Amino acid sequence: MDNILKHIGNTPLVQINKHVWAKLESVNPSGSIKDRIAKYMVEMAEKRGELKKGYTVIEATSGNTGISLAMICAMKGYMMIAVMPENTSKRKIKMIEAFGAKTILTPKKEKFKGAIEKTYYLAKKYKKVWLPRQFENPDNVKCHEIGLGKEIANIKIDAFVAGIGTGGTLMGVAKAIPKARIIGVQAEETFHRIEGVSDGIIPKILDNSLIDRIIKIKSKDAIKRTKRIAREQGLFVGISSGANVLAAEIVAKKFNNVITVLPDSGERYPEIW
């Protein structure tokens, strides 16, 4: 049963254009980069004795982490509850439920903070609970430092570009490749369609001193670039991939070797096609 976990990570590095390359994370078992942290956080919690048989895993998510955790919880026999804003992609909600996990939606106006607060409330209802707390869990950073960061460490890289999100991807790569310029990506709008890039909270694991620049991308521009990636590169990716590539192309005007990530698949956002 655990064999599928061996296929998480070591994703392909694909060329977008002359100066931009990207890790294709949709090839992970559940279809996104979040498989990496879900696996690592669960395994570390088990190792420390924080997560045991009979426990319920409760996490606030914009979708992808919930899907990844639901997959792993299904394999390991844990009950899973995913809490997410009501504007989360319906496809993602259905995918989480397909793994047998429960989903709870919080008001859009409360943004991601509302989902996090709901997990604390739910934690009081269950006697045996483990909260991954991806926004403050140092295992999130460590996972990308020894995983994604290590995978690209031997490549000549001038800059690494990724959505800020939980901060884990950026911080992990920053620690693995200290000489690389670290560029964060955020949505320009308060209410946007780029899931997983800007969640409306400041992650505790985010160290701003390690970020060299933040680039803001409009939702409509991210969607347009996502469609171009499909039509020009043959890569069916999600909206955050379009945002990351746009930001990487801005950075590539100054630097020759820029690496970014394509976090998930376009199948999760049928409404944009």
Where are the predicted features?
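PLP-dependent amino-acid enzyme catalytic core
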Residues: 1-273
